[in-house]
From Swiss-Prot:
Record key words, sorted: ATP-binding, Cytoplasm, Helicase, Hydrolase, Nucleotide-binding, Ribosome biogenesis, RNA-binding
Motif extent (Q motif): 2-30
Name recorded for this polypeptide: ATP-dependent RNA helicase DbpA
InterPro entries on file: DbpA/CsdA_RNA-bd_dom, DEAD/DEAH_box_helicase_dom, DEAD_box_RNA_helicase, DEAD_helicase_DbpA, Helicase_ATP-bd, Helicase_C-like, Nucleotide-bd_a/b_plait_sf, P-loop_NTPase
Domain notes: Contains an N-terminal domain that binds non-specifically to RNA and a C-terminal domain that binds specifically and tightly to hairpin 92 of 23S rRNA. Undergoes a conformation change in the helicase core upon binding of RNA and ATP.
Subunit details: May interact with RNA helicases CshA and CshB.
Length: 479
């Protein structure tokens, strides 16, 4: 049996993987991790939900030099949600090595990101537009950059970001390792790899066609005006613990969410017209299981790693065949079984034919639930509707439960460095350097993570201990 211990990975990274519940590597991880550790250029064709973030995150954290303050790796993602997700994953994987990851994306304070990039940032994750902005303004130093990851490259192409990606690449050092990940490999992506990569190794992790065998696919034919009635019947008979309902437009999402809410269904929505903070809040609440139904546009179809979504409903069939793969890929993740049901009108039949040709099989046509079936399932559905959904455990919860972040009211302007905190805190009785996590030094403040449940002890001692001869105020950090 393959195990992460078989790779050239340090104890700090292995310890974090164990805390995250990673036991054996997925297929893509088995192929990518050894090659990435050898600093090979890679073109990886792999489905969503295959564990690919960890496949590049683990080697990047392993290869990063903690003592180097400037960014050593840049990860480009098509969406803000994915940038935040990848940053969190990198932070968790590199927790005990004190790897600092920074996320930069649009519709968020440029100055705040600029200030964060001035601190030690080993790995930067961002969307192409904002990354290019930082590069052109000189706020993202590139002279120590050794690794570039282009994630969800086909989605970059669909969203019109490839020119920005190329502009970014032209600013980067030519001596670097480049890894490109994509669910599909259109011609333009192949061209990008030929132009900017050095003899890349091609890795393809085959599933049963373009969509995993863990997903049961079905189609129900329906008139547009009968869709909502059908949705109610399907939700009642399927009675999922966790479900995403996809619509084509934000207007449709808003309308459908209001209608479900009026019926008392525990639901929320996510689409591109919402402000960033609201989108993040909605996704986090859905991850935690605070409601069962998420109504969404394609903005939620990529990059959000939520296990145990049992049902995806295409209320509106996607007009682009790639979107079908990415939407339905939200279920059947991490080895779990899932189901994808698509509502198809007469107008949408031609798009269904394109999808079936693309995924390589005919999707099973099923009848709408009968009224007898709906009546039979109704009591069970209503009983679950009145129960609060069971809160889901975030995979990083176990890893982070013994971590306390401390705030100190001094930083660069007081000539304080990360090593000063390490030297001072490691001298406390019962505390070692292994108990110190990520350290962030700002102009007038510093944040230090204390690991292994030793935060309260360190907080108490540091109230009366100087750092580099300076007595700093210390409190448990709010963020």
């Amino acid at each position: 049996m393959s195990h992460f211990k078989n790779y050239q990975i340090s104890h700090d990274i292995l310890r974090a993987l164990e805390g995250l519940g990673y036991t054996e590597p997925t297929k893509v991880q088995q192929s990518v991790i050894p090659a990435a550790l050898e600093r090979k250029d890679l073109v990886v064709k792999s489905q969503t939900g295959s564990g690919k973030t960890a496949s590049f995150g683990i080697p990047l954290c392993e290869l990063a030099n903690w003592d180097e303050n400037k960014p050593q790796a840049l990860i480009l993602t098509p969406t803000r949600e994915l940038a935040v997700q990848v940053k969190e994953d990198i932070t968790n994987i590199g927790r005990f090595k004190r790897i600092k990851a920074t996320a930069v994306f649009g519709k968020s304070s440029f100055d705040k990101q600029k200030a964060e990039l001035k601190q030690k940032s080993h790995i930067v994750v961002g969307t192409p537009g904002r990354v290019l902005d930082h590069i052109e303004k000189g706020t993202l130093p590139l002279d120590r950059l050794s690794y570039l990851v282009i994630d969800e490259a086909d989605e970059m192409l669909n969203m019109g970001f490839i020119e920005q990606v190329e502009a970014i690449i032209k600013h980067l050092p030519t001596e670097r390792t480049t890894m490109l990940f994509s669910a599909t490999l259109p011609q333009d992506i192949e061209k990008l790899s030929r132009q900017y990569m050095q003899n890349p190794e091609h890795i393809e992790v085959k599933a049963a066609g373009l969509t995993t065998r863990n997903i049961e696919h079905a189609v129900i034919q329906v008139r547009e005006e009968n869709k909502f009635s059908l949705l109610k019947d399907v939700l009642m008979t399927e009675n999922p613990d966790s479900c995403i309902i996809f619509c084509r437009t934000k207007e449709h999402v808003n309308q459908l969410t209001d209608e479900l809410d009026d019926l008392g269904y525990p639901c929320d929505k996510i689409h591109g017209g919402m402000i960033q903070e609201d989108r993040f809040d909605v996704m986090n609440e859905f991850k935690r299981g605070e409601y069962r139904y998420l109504v969404a546009t394609d903005v939620a179809a990529r990059g959000i790693d939520i296990e145990n979504i049992s049902l995806v409903i295409n209320y509106d069939l996607p007009l682009e065949k790639e979107s079908y793969v990415h939407r339905t890929g939200r279920t059947g993740r991490a080895g779990n079984k899932g189901k994808a049901i698509s509502f198809v009108t007469a107008f949408e039949k031609r798009f269904l034919a394109d999808i079936e040709e693309y995924i390589g099989f005919e999707i099973q046509k099923i009848e709408a639930p009968s009224q007898e079936e709906v009546a039979r399932k109704k009591p069970e559905f209503l009983a679950k509707l009145n129960d609060r959904p069971e809160s889901k455990k975030d995979k990083s919860e176990e890893l982070n439960k013994d971590i306390m972040k401390l705030y100190f009211n001094g930083g660069k302007k007081k000539k304080i460095r990360a090593v000063d905190f390490v030297g001072t805190i490691a001298k406390i009785d019962g505390v070692s350097a292994d108990d110190i996590g990520i350290i962030t030094i700002m102009d007038n403040a510093s944040y230090v993570e204390i690991l292994n449940g030793k935060g309260p002890h360190v907080l108490k001692v540091m109230k009366n201990t100087t750092v580099k001869g300076k007595q700093l105020k210390v409190n448990k950090a709010n963020k």
